[in-house]
Curated annotation (Swiss-Prot):
Amino-acid positions noted as binding a ubiquinone in the UniProt annotation, renumbered to this chain: 202
GO molecular-function term, one example from the UniProt record: ubiquinol-cytochrome-c reductase activity
Name listed for the protein in its UniProt record: Cytochrome b
UniProt: heme b b562 binding residues: 84, 183
Similarity annotation: Belongs to the cytochrome b family.
Segments passing through the bilayer: 34-54, 78-99, 114-134, 179-199, 227-247, 289-309, 321-341, 348-368
Subcellular location: Mitochondrion inner membrane
Keywords assigned by UniProt, alphabetized: Electron transport, Heme, Iron, Membrane, Metal-binding, Mitochondrion, Mitochondrion inner membrane, Respiratory chain, Transmembrane, Transmembrane helix, Transport, Ubiquinone
Further details from the record: Heme 1 (or BL or b562) is low-potential and absorbs at about 562 nm, and heme 2 (or BH or b566) is high-potential and absorbs at about 566 nm.
Length: 380
Protein backbone atom coordinates (compact mmCIF):
# COMPACT_ATOMS: atom_id res chain seq x y z
CA UNK A 1 0.00 0.00 0.00
CA UNK A 2 1.31 3.49 -0.88
CA UNK A 3 2.48 5.47 2.19
CA UNK A 4 0.04 8.15 3.32
CA UNK A 5 1.66 11.58 2.73
CA UNK A 6 -0.13 12.85 5.85
CA UNK A 7 1.88 10.39 7.91
CA UNK A 8 5.18 10.40 6.02
CA UNK A 9 5.88 14.04 5.05
CA UNK A 10 8.16 15.66 7.71
CA UNK A 11 5.92 18.75 8.14
CA UNK A 12 2.50 17.21 7.52
CA UNK A 13 3.42 14.45 9.97
CA UNK A 14 3.66 17.05 12.76
CA UNK A 15 0.29 18.56 11.82
CA UNK A 16 -1.20 15.07 11.64
CA UNK A 17 0.08 14.10 15.08
CA UNK A 18 -1.18 17.35 16.61
CA UNK A 19 -4.54 17.90 14.92
CA UNK A 20 -5.71 14.78 13.07
CA UNK A 21 -4.58 11.44 14.50
CA UNK A 22 -3.99 12.80 18.00
CA UNK A 23 -5.52 10.41 20.57
CA UNK A 24 -7.90 12.46 22.75
CA UNK A 25 -9.97 11.42 25.80
CA UNK A 26 -13.52 10.55 24.71
CA UNK A 27 -15.17 12.45 27.56
CA UNK A 28 -13.61 15.94 27.46
CA UNK A 29 -16.35 18.57 27.79
CA UNK A 30 -16.83 22.04 26.29
CA UNK A 31 -14.41 23.36 28.95
CA UNK A 32 -11.65 21.81 26.80
CA UNK A 33 -12.64 24.05 23.86
CA UNK A 34 -10.94 27.17 25.20
CA UNK A 35 -7.42 26.16 24.14
CA UNK A 36 -8.40 26.14 20.47
CA UNK A 37 -10.50 29.29 21.00
CA UNK A 38 -7.38 31.03 22.34
CA UNK A 39 -5.50 29.94 19.23
CA UNK A 40 -8.20 31.46 17.03
CA UNK A 41 -8.21 34.63 19.16
CA UNK A 42 -4.45 34.93 18.63
CA UNK A 43 -4.74 34.48 14.86
CA UNK A 44 -7.59 37.02 14.67
CA UNK A 45 -5.65 39.54 16.76
CA UNK A 46 -2.48 39.12 14.67
CA UNK A 47 -4.44 39.52 11.42
CA UNK A 48 -6.48 42.58 12.50
CA UNK A 49 -3.40 44.01 14.26
CA UNK A 50 -1.31 43.70 11.11
CA UNK A 51 -3.98 45.52 9.08
CA UNK A 52 -4.19 48.26 11.74
CA UNK A 53 -0.39 48.63 11.89
CA UNK A 54 -0.40 49.44 8.16
CA UNK A 55 -2.36 52.63 8.90
CA UNK A 56 -0.97 53.50 12.34
CA UNK A 57 1.74 56.09 13.06
CA UNK A 58 3.69 55.65 16.30
CA UNK A 59 4.24 59.34 17.02
CA UNK A 60 2.67 61.39 19.82
CA UNK A 61 1.48 64.11 17.42
CA UNK A 62 -0.05 61.65 14.95
CA UNK A 63 -1.06 58.47 16.84
CA UNK A 64 -4.53 59.63 17.91
CA UNK A 65 -5.36 61.09 14.48
CA UNK A 66 -4.01 58.02 12.68
CA UNK A 67 -6.44 55.80 14.63
CA UNK A 68 -9.30 58.21 13.85
CA UNK A 69 -8.20 58.21 10.19
CA UNK A 70 -8.26 54.39 10.13
CA UNK A 71 -11.83 54.39 11.43
CA UNK A 72 -13.07 57.13 9.09
CA UNK A 73 -11.19 56.73 5.81
CA UNK A 74 -9.86 53.18 5.53
CA UNK A 75 -12.16 50.56 3.92
CA UNK A 76 -13.74 48.74 6.88
CA UNK A 77 -11.12 50.34 9.13
CA UNK A 78 -13.77 50.87 11.82
CA UNK A 79 -14.60 47.14 11.72
CA UNK A 80 -10.95 46.06 11.89
CA UNK A 81 -10.33 48.37 14.84
CA UNK A 82 -13.50 47.28 16.68
CA UNK A 83 -12.72 43.60 16.14
CA UNK A 84 -9.16 44.13 17.40
CA UNK A 85 -10.18 46.10 20.51
CA UNK A 86 -13.02 43.74 21.47
CA UNK A 87 -11.04 40.69 20.35
CA UNK A 88 -8.65 41.49 23.20
CA UNK A 89 -11.56 41.25 25.65
CA UNK A 90 -12.59 37.87 24.26
CA UNK A 91 -8.97 36.72 24.41
CA UNK A 92 -8.99 37.44 28.15
CA UNK A 93 -12.44 35.89 28.70
CA UNK A 94 -11.15 32.70 27.04
CA UNK A 95 -7.84 32.63 28.92
CA UNK A 96 -9.53 33.20 32.31
CA UNK A 97 -12.04 30.40 31.60
CA UNK A 98 -9.16 28.19 30.37
CA UNK A 99 -7.20 28.79 33.60
CA UNK A 100 -10.35 28.25 35.69
CA UNK A 101 -10.88 24.92 33.90
CA UNK A 102 -7.27 23.93 34.58
CA UNK A 103 -7.67 24.84 38.23
CA UNK A 104 -10.97 22.99 38.69
CA UNK A 105 -9.89 19.77 37.01
CA UNK A 106 -6.33 19.67 38.39
CA UNK A 107 -4.68 20.15 34.97
CA UNK A 108 -1.91 22.08 36.76
CA UNK A 109 -0.38 18.73 37.73
CA UNK A 110 1.07 18.70 34.21
CA UNK A 111 3.67 21.12 35.55
CA UNK A 112 5.45 22.07 32.31
CA UNK A 113 2.20 22.70 30.45
CA UNK A 114 0.85 24.74 33.37
CA UNK A 115 4.02 26.83 33.80
CA UNK A 116 4.27 27.68 30.10
CA UNK A 117 0.58 28.60 30.31
CA UNK A 118 1.21 31.05 33.16
CA UNK A 119 4.11 32.56 31.17
CA UNK A 120 1.68 32.88 28.23
CA UNK A 121 -0.78 34.72 30.50
CA UNK A 122 1.94 37.15 31.63
CA UNK A 123 3.00 37.77 28.01
CA UNK A 124 -0.63 38.35 27.00
CA UNK A 125 -1.06 40.85 29.85
CA UNK A 126 2.08 42.71 28.75
CA UNK A 127 0.86 42.75 25.13
CA UNK A 128 -2.57 44.10 26.09
CA UNK A 129 -1.01 46.77 28.31
CA UNK A 130 1.38 48.14 25.66
CA UNK A 131 -1.38 47.90 23.05
CA UNK A 132 -3.77 49.99 25.15
CA UNK A 133 -1.24 52.84 25.13
CA UNK A 134 -1.07 53.07 21.31
CA UNK A 135 -4.25 55.10 20.53
CA UNK A 136 -2.69 57.82 22.75
CA UNK A 137 -5.92 58.90 24.41
CA UNK A 138 -6.12 60.23 27.97
CA UNK A 139 -6.52 56.80 29.59
CA UNK A 140 -3.76 55.37 27.35
CA UNK A 141 -1.32 58.04 28.51
CA UNK A 142 -2.23 58.04 32.20
CA UNK A 143 -2.51 54.25 32.35
CA UNK A 144 1.01 54.01 30.93
CA UNK A 145 2.25 56.63 33.41
CA UNK A 146 0.69 54.96 36.46
CA UNK A 147 1.69 51.37 35.64
CA UNK A 148 5.26 52.08 34.47
CA UNK A 149 5.70 54.29 37.54
CA UNK A 150 5.12 51.23 39.74
CA UNK A 151 8.59 49.97 38.82
CA UNK A 152 10.05 52.96 40.70
CA UNK A 153 8.99 51.12 43.89
CA UNK A 154 11.82 48.63 43.30
CA UNK A 155 14.53 49.57 45.82
CA UNK A 156 17.75 51.20 44.59
CA UNK A 157 17.32 50.64 40.81
CA UNK A 158 13.62 51.56 40.53
CA UNK A 159 13.84 55.16 39.34
CA UNK A 160 16.63 54.39 36.87
CA UNK A 161 14.61 51.46 35.54
CA UNK A 162 11.51 53.62 34.97
CA UNK A 163 13.43 56.38 33.17
CA UNK A 164 15.12 53.71 31.06
CA UNK A 165 11.71 52.21 30.17
CA UNK A 166 10.28 55.66 29.36
CA UNK A 167 13.29 56.75 27.31
CA UNK A 168 13.17 60.09 29.14
CA UNK A 169 11.79 61.74 32.26
CA UNK A 170 8.13 61.10 31.47
CA UNK A 171 5.91 59.05 29.17
CA UNK A 172 6.53 60.67 25.77
CA UNK A 173 7.36 59.96 22.14
CA UNK A 174 10.18 57.42 22.82
CA UNK A 175 7.78 55.51 25.11
CA UNK A 176 5.09 55.33 22.44
CA UNK A 177 7.58 54.21 19.77
CA UNK A 178 8.98 51.37 21.89
CA UNK A 179 5.51 50.30 23.05
CA UNK A 180 4.47 49.97 19.41
CA UNK A 181 7.58 47.89 18.69
CA UNK A 182 6.79 45.67 21.70
CA UNK A 183 3.12 45.37 20.78
CA UNK A 184 4.14 44.18 17.33
CA UNK A 185 6.72 41.71 18.66
CA UNK A 186 4.97 40.10 21.65
CA UNK A 187 2.10 38.34 19.78
CA UNK A 188 4.69 36.38 17.79
CA UNK A 189 6.38 35.49 21.06
CA UNK A 190 2.95 34.30 22.28
CA UNK A 191 2.66 32.17 19.12
CA UNK A 192 6.07 30.60 19.83
CA UNK A 193 5.19 29.94 23.48
CA UNK A 194 1.89 28.39 22.34
CA UNK A 195 3.84 25.80 20.33
CA UNK A 196 5.93 25.00 23.42
CA UNK A 197 2.72 24.81 25.49
CA UNK A 198 1.23 22.32 22.99
CA UNK A 199 4.47 20.31 22.80
CA UNK A 200 4.37 19.80 26.57
CA UNK A 201 0.64 19.01 26.49
CA UNK A 202 1.11 16.34 23.81
CA UNK A 203 3.84 14.70 25.91
CA UNK A 204 1.23 13.70 28.49
CA UNK A 205 -2.05 13.94 26.59
CA UNK A 206 -5.13 15.84 27.78
CA UNK A 207 -6.62 15.61 31.24
CA UNK A 208 -10.38 14.92 31.41
CA UNK A 209 -13.39 15.83 33.62
CA UNK A 210 -12.95 12.72 35.79
CA UNK A 211 -9.28 13.48 36.45
CA UNK A 212 -8.36 9.82 35.81
CA UNK A 213 -6.04 8.17 33.27
CA UNK A 214 -7.93 7.79 29.99
CA UNK A 215 -5.44 5.78 27.91
CA UNK A 216 -7.89 2.86 27.66
CA UNK A 217 -10.51 5.03 25.95
CA UNK A 218 -9.08 7.44 23.38
CA UNK A 219 -10.64 8.69 20.15
CA UNK A 220 -8.99 10.47 17.18
CA UNK A 221 -9.00 14.27 17.33
CA UNK A 222 -10.38 14.47 13.79
CA UNK A 223 -13.32 14.49 13.07
CA UNK A 224 -14.71 14.50 16.62
CA UNK A 225 -12.91 17.44 18.18
CA UNK A 226 -12.19 19.38 14.98
CA UNK A 227 -15.96 19.61 14.53
CA UNK A 228 -16.52 20.42 18.19
CA UNK A 229 -13.87 23.17 17.97
CA UNK A 230 -15.51 24.68 14.87
CA UNK A 231 -18.79 24.88 16.81
CA UNK A 232 -16.83 26.65 19.57
CA UNK A 233 -15.40 29.14 17.04
CA UNK A 234 -18.88 29.95 15.79
CA UNK A 235 -20.21 30.40 19.32
CA UNK A 236 -17.35 32.80 20.09
CA UNK A 237 -17.40 34.81 16.86
CA UNK A 238 -21.14 35.43 17.23
CA UNK A 239 -20.90 37.54 20.44
CA UNK A 240 -17.61 39.09 19.24
CA UNK A 241 -19.10 40.37 15.98
CA UNK A 242 -22.30 41.39 17.80
CA UNK A 243 -20.23 43.46 20.22
CA UNK A 244 -18.00 44.93 17.49
CA UNK A 245 -20.99 45.88 15.32
CA UNK A 246 -23.63 46.99 17.83
CA UNK A 247 -21.79 48.42 20.84
CA UNK A 248 -18.07 48.55 20.04
CA UNK A 249 -17.28 51.03 22.84
CA UNK A 250 -19.19 49.23 25.59
CA UNK A 251 -16.04 47.91 27.28
CA UNK A 252 -13.85 50.95 26.57
CA UNK A 253 -13.34 54.10 28.63
CA UNK A 254 -14.94 57.34 27.32
CA UNK A 255 -11.83 59.16 28.58
CA UNK A 256 -9.86 57.60 25.71
CA UNK A 257 -11.78 59.67 23.14
CA UNK A 258 -9.84 62.69 24.41
CA UNK A 259 -6.28 62.98 23.02
CA UNK A 260 -3.51 62.48 25.62
CA UNK A 261 -2.75 65.59 27.66
CA UNK A 262 0.06 65.43 30.27
CA UNK A 263 -1.36 68.56 31.97
CA UNK A 264 -4.83 67.14 32.74
CA UNK A 265 -5.29 64.05 34.90
CA UNK A 266 -8.55 62.07 34.40
CA UNK A 267 -10.75 61.90 37.55
CA UNK A 268 -10.58 58.08 37.71
CA UNK A 269 -7.58 56.30 36.22
CA UNK A 270 -8.47 52.66 35.67
CA UNK A 271 -7.34 49.90 33.30
CA UNK A 272 -9.51 47.82 30.95
CA UNK A 273 -11.94 45.41 32.70
CA UNK A 274 -9.64 42.38 32.38
CA UNK A 275 -6.99 43.98 34.63
CA UNK A 276 -9.38 45.35 37.27
CA UNK A 277 -9.03 42.39 39.68
CA UNK A 278 -5.24 42.88 39.80
CA UNK A 279 -5.66 46.68 39.98
CA UNK A 280 -7.98 46.27 42.99
CA UNK A 281 -5.35 44.11 44.73
CA UNK A 282 -2.68 46.73 43.92
CA UNK A 283 -4.81 49.55 45.39
CA UNK A 284 -5.82 47.61 48.50
CA UNK A 285 -2.33 48.00 50.02
CA UNK A 286 -1.52 51.56 51.16
CA UNK A 287 2.23 51.07 50.60
CA UNK A 288 3.67 51.44 47.07
CA UNK A 289 6.16 48.55 47.16
CA UNK A 290 3.67 46.35 49.05
CA UNK A 291 1.04 47.04 46.40
CA UNK A 292 3.44 46.18 43.58
CA UNK A 293 4.40 42.91 45.29
CA UNK A 294 0.73 42.02 45.84
CA UNK A 295 -0.02 42.85 42.19
CA UNK A 296 2.79 40.54 41.03
CA UNK A 297 1.74 37.85 43.51
CA UNK A 298 -1.88 37.94 42.28
CA UNK A 299 -0.78 36.33 38.99
CA UNK A 300 2.47 34.59 40.03
CA UNK A 301 0.55 32.64 42.70
CA UNK A 302 -0.60 30.42 39.80
CA UNK A 303 2.93 28.97 39.63
CA UNK A 304 2.35 27.53 43.12
CA UNK A 305 -0.85 25.63 42.20
CA UNK A 306 0.90 22.25 41.62
CA UNK A 307 2.65 22.47 45.01
CA UNK A 308 -0.54 23.35 46.89
CA UNK A 309 -2.42 20.29 45.61
CA UNK A 310 -2.81 18.06 48.66
CA UNK A 311 -5.84 16.00 47.57
CA UNK A 312 -5.44 12.39 46.45
CA UNK A 313 -7.99 12.96 43.70
CA UNK A 314 -6.92 15.11 40.79
CA UNK A 315 -10.12 16.88 39.70
CA UNK A 316 -12.66 18.62 41.92
CA UNK A 317 -15.45 16.60 40.26
CA UNK A 318 -15.98 14.45 43.36
CA UNK A 319 -14.75 16.95 45.98
CA UNK A 320 -17.73 19.12 47.08
CA UNK A 321 -15.79 21.15 49.68
CA UNK A 322 -13.13 22.17 47.17
CA UNK A 323 -15.89 22.95 44.66
CA UNK A 324 -17.54 25.31 47.13
CA UNK A 325 -14.19 27.00 47.74
CA UNK A 326 -13.54 27.27 43.99
CA UNK A 327 -16.85 29.05 43.35
CA UNK A 328 -16.27 31.35 46.33
CA UNK A 329 -12.93 32.24 44.68
CA UNK A 330 -14.73 32.98 41.38
CA UNK A 331 -17.26 35.22 43.17
CA UNK A 332 -14.36 36.90 44.98
CA UNK A 333 -12.68 37.68 41.63
CA UNK A 334 -15.91 39.27 40.38
CA UNK A 335 -16.00 41.41 43.55
CA UNK A 336 -12.37 42.46 42.99
CA UNK A 337 -13.15 43.34 39.36
CA UNK A 338 -16.09 45.49 40.46
CA UNK A 339 -14.10 47.21 43.25
CA UNK A 340 -11.27 47.97 40.81
CA UNK A 341 -13.70 49.98 38.67
CA UNK A 342 -14.89 52.09 41.63
CA UNK A 343 -13.26 55.25 43.05
CA UNK A 344 -10.90 54.97 46.04
CA UNK A 345 -13.34 55.86 48.82
CA UNK A 346 -15.42 54.23 51.54
CA UNK A 347 -16.79 51.48 51.38
CA UNK A 348 -14.78 50.34 48.32
CA UNK A 349 -11.42 50.56 50.11
CA UNK A 350 -12.35 48.08 52.85
CA UNK A 351 -14.25 45.80 50.43
CA UNK A 352 -11.15 45.68 48.19
CA UNK A 353 -8.87 44.92 51.13
CA UNK A 354 -11.12 42.11 52.38
CA UNK A 355 -11.52 40.65 48.88
CA UNK A 356 -7.73 40.77 48.32
CA UNK A 357 -7.11 39.02 51.64
CA UNK A 358 -9.76 36.40 50.80
CA UNK A 359 -8.19 35.81 47.36
CA UNK A 360 -4.77 34.90 48.78
CA UNK A 361 -6.23 33.04 51.78
CA UNK A 362 -8.33 30.75 49.58
CA UNK A 363 -5.48 30.00 47.16
CA UNK A 364 -2.60 29.61 49.61
CA UNK A 365 -4.25 28.31 52.78
CA UNK A 366 -7.81 27.03 52.35
CA UNK A 367 -7.33 24.93 49.18
CA UNK A 368 -4.48 22.78 50.62
CA UNK A 369 -6.30 22.38 53.97
CA UNK A 370 -9.56 21.41 52.25
CA UNK A 371 -7.72 18.91 50.03
CA UNK A 372 -6.14 17.26 53.07
CA UNK A 373 -9.48 17.29 54.92
CA UNK A 374 -11.24 15.58 52.00
CA UNK A 375 -8.55 12.87 52.02
CA UNK A 376 -9.43 12.20 55.67
CA UNK A 377 -13.18 12.20 54.96
CA UNK A 378 -12.74 9.75 52.07
CA UNK A 379 -10.43 7.54 54.18
CA UNK A 380 -7.47 7.95 51.83
Amino acid sequence: MAPNIRKSHPLLKMVNNSLIDLPAPSNISAWWNFGSLLGVCLLTQILTGLLLAMHYTADTTLAFSSVAHTCRNVQYGWLIRNLHANGASFFFICIYLHIGRGFYYGSYLYKETWNTGVILLLTLMATAFVGYVLPWGQMSFWGATVITNLFSAIPYIGQTLVEWAWGGFSVDNPTLTRFFALHFLLPFMIAGLTLIHLTFLHESGSNNPLGIVSNCDKIPFHPYFTLKDILGFMLMFLPLTTLALFSPNLLGDPENFTPANPLVTPPHIKPEWYFLFAYAILRSIPNKLGGVLALAASVLVLFLAPFLHKAKQRAMTFRPLSQLLFWILVANLFILTWVGSQPVEHPFIIIGQLASLTYFTILLILFPITGALENKMLNY
